[in-house]
Amino acid sequence: IDTVTDREEDVVGRVYEYFLGKFAATEGKRGGEFYTPKCVVNLIAEMIEPYRGKIYDPCCGSGGMFVQSVKFVESHEGSKRDVSIYGQELTATTYKLAKMNLAIRGIAANLGEVPADTFFKDQHPDLKADFILANPPFNLKEWRGTDELLDDPRWAGYEVPPTGNANYGWILHMISKLSENGVAGFILANGALSGGGEEYKIRRKMIENDLVEAIMVLPRDMFYTTDISVTLWILNKNKKEHTVKLNGVTKHYRDRTG
């Protein structure tokens, strides 16, 4: 093991991460679009525990989710070779920031050949990920035209997400990307919990399909983009295998002893 090289990569990576955070703070909303605070990224990684397998972020920004996932693996005596990383980013400049962020740390990743819209030009159409970590743009409006994506296979079994807000488009995209044992952790604005119409029907179907493992409300003022409250969603396609009955009550859990 080349410990000197490892230390140098870590120092350079931390410096890069520091300046990303400073830039996001200075730029405000524009900067926050590519940067998720480290504490939030760390929380998602600790909750879904991406020890080994394929990791995906459909709106990867500057690549912070991937960096923290690799740190999580290495902190549990694993190796970055234990995970395969896939991502996509729409903005060309942010796409370059992500590639640089990962290259500095020696992390191999497939971010697609070019920056592209996840909904209209999926760079990983056949991917089934074991872990998804994401912080989609909050309440993205007019993300598709009224007559666009109506028969998209990603919505199969659900209502078509409304045109006025992309929150449930992101959710269904991520569900479609999960492997049969996949787990997803992602951040959404609190309003995603109470939307009516198609959003309500999609939410109800997710519960009927037993996908929702947890939803946690996070403190305000954690993001540079907004001061609204946000929630962390955990979806788990393997939840049924970790179900027990205790005193007549069904409880769901994930084995955290590994």
Question: Can you say where each PLM-predicted feature lies in the sequence?
Answer:
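Short glycine/serine/proline-enriched coil/turn segments at secondary-structure junctions
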Residues: 194-195, 222-226
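Core catalytic lobe of class I
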Residues: 1, 210-211, 218, 228
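Non-catalytic, mostly N-terminal accessory regions of nucleic-acid modification and defense proteins
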Residues: 1-51, 110-123, 217-220, 242-258
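Glycine-rich S-adenosyl-L-methionine
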Residues: 153-178
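Short glycine-dipeptide loop
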Residues: 51, 178-184
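Short hydrophobic/aromatic beta-strand or adjacent loop that forms the aromatic wall/cage
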Residues: 228-232, 257
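Catalytic-loop motifs flanking and including active-site residues across diverse enzymes
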Residues: 40, 167-170, 229
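Conserved S-adenosyl-L-methionine
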Residues: 30-134, 139-149, 154-157, 189-191, ...
